[in-house]
Design a protein with these regions (language model features):
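N-terminal "arm"/small-domain region of PLP-dependent enzymes with the aminotransferase-like
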Residues: 1-62
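PLP-dependent aminotransferase class I/II
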Residues: 44, 67, 210-288, 293-295
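Short acidic capping loops at alpha-helix termini that bridge into adjacent secondary structure
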Residues: 82-86, 106-109, 154, 191, ...
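Active-site phosphate-binding strand-loop segment of PLP-dependent enzymes
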Residues: 138-195
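Conserved PLP-binding catalytic core of the aspartate aminotransferase-like
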Residues: 276, 289-323, 340
């Protein structure tokens, strides 16, 4: 018997999602890690203190509260929703996986607006569905008519990342509202970056049964390593999600830390303001550098285009890495030729990035 003979076709057809890691021979302190939109603007000491309080209050010999119920209770109370309208999981990625388990099978279709987060397509293909990509307009706005034209009776889900990764812009509420009213399926609005933007559609959950809002603690709270994502939706959607989730899917440390972090919201809100201010500082500096053009951002990252004629985004990204600054080359994506995404860091990181970028453009 060959193992590949009994492996599902959908698994054979996908490849492992690659993530750039820091070279072991270089210390993390030396590297400006600005490629994965993690929040290093929050001092690590602050996070460590919360973790210490967590470890003093839990017993990891016991199984965690089932289905993330401790975190679910804290989140629902914080947002003003009932616990029956919230589902939590190991990162937003697992929420996507759970949505696919509920809604997608072979023959199902999932619409994505591109360019956007690639994991929507990854999970769709894993469950035998097909992704129907719809391009954003040249100004990165939603083409609602094009989305609705692509939908048919087999279309189960529509993913809209707002603010969008990697373009950085938040979509118009009027466009999202029209999709909710006219799309005959579940509209998943990924608000992982919403804390850095001006508005949210999360309260629309009370008005639209087909709205599911996806959020994360990785960005605004700087807790990417703990892996906690959550979904706010109608009780019917959440009920189906709960049916397919494992009983102990979120560990005790993560759940308790999330509860404690939410109690310190005023602190994290100030850190969000700091990131937004640093984003504006970074934007102004990028606008003053010949050879690049930055795009407006409602997130904790900025997308910019390499416009110097003899360079590509891949070359600049490689040169930046040689200077111990990691950024994300997005130049291979549709509409984003020669574009690079950089995470907003603390001032030291941002200054190092600006210096490395200038050198990389002139090398």
């Amino acid at each position: 018997m060959k193992i590949e003979d009994i492996v599902q076709k959908e698994v054979k057809d996908i490849s492992c999602y690659e993530v750039k890691t820091i070279l072991e021979q270089k210390s993390q302190e030396k590297i400006a890690k600005m490629n994965l939109n993690e929040n290093f603007a929050i001092p690590n000491d602050t996070i460590q203190k919360i973790l210490v309080d967590t470890c003093r209050s839990i017993d990891v010999r016991a199984y965690p509260p089932p289905r993330g119920s401790l975190a679910c209770k804290a989140i629902s109370s914080f947002l003003g929703f009932s616990e029956s309208e919230v589902s939590v999981a190991n990162g937003a990625d697992e929420i996507m996986d759970l949505l696919m388990k509920v809604f997608v099978r072979k023959g199902s279709k999932v619409i994505t607006v591109e360019p956007s987060f690639p994991m929507y397509t990854f999970f769709t293909q894993l469950y035998g569905g097909s992704t129907v990509p719809v391009l954003l307009r040249p100004d990165f706005s939603l083409d609602v008519d094009a989305v609705l034209e692509k939908a048919d009776k087999n279309t189960k889900l529509l993913f809209v990342c707002s603010p969008n990764n990697p373009t950085g812009n938040q979509f118009r509420e009027s466009d999202i509202k029209r999709l909710l009213q006219e799309f005959n399926g579940v509209v998943v609005v990924d608000e992982a970056y919403v804390d850095f933007a001006q508005g949210s559609v999360i309260n629309w959950v009370r008005d639209y049964d087909n709205l599911a809002v996806l959020r994360s603690f990785s960005k605004a709270f700087g807790l990417a390593g703990l892996r906690l994502g959550y979904l706010v939706s109608s009780t019917s959607v959440v009920d189906y999600i709960q049916r397919v989730v494992g009983p102990f899917n979120v560990n005790s440390v993560t759940q308790q830390t999330i509860a404690l972090a939410l109690e310190k919201w005023s602190y994290f809100k100030e850190q969000i303001k700091y990131v937004v201010n640093e984003r504006e500082w970074l934007m102004k500096n990028l606008q003053q550098i010949d050879g690049v053009t930055p795009y407006p951002s409602d997130t904790n990252f900025i997308l910019f285009k390499v416009t110097k004629s003899d360079l590509t985004s891949a070359i600049v990204t490689e040169r930046m890495e040689a200077r111990d600054v990691l950024v994300k080359d997005r130049g291979h994506l549709t509409l984003l030729e020669n574009c690079i995404r950089v995470t907003v860091g603390n001032r030291n990181m941002n200054e190092k990035f600006v210096s490395a970028l200038k050198e990389s453009l002139e090398e």
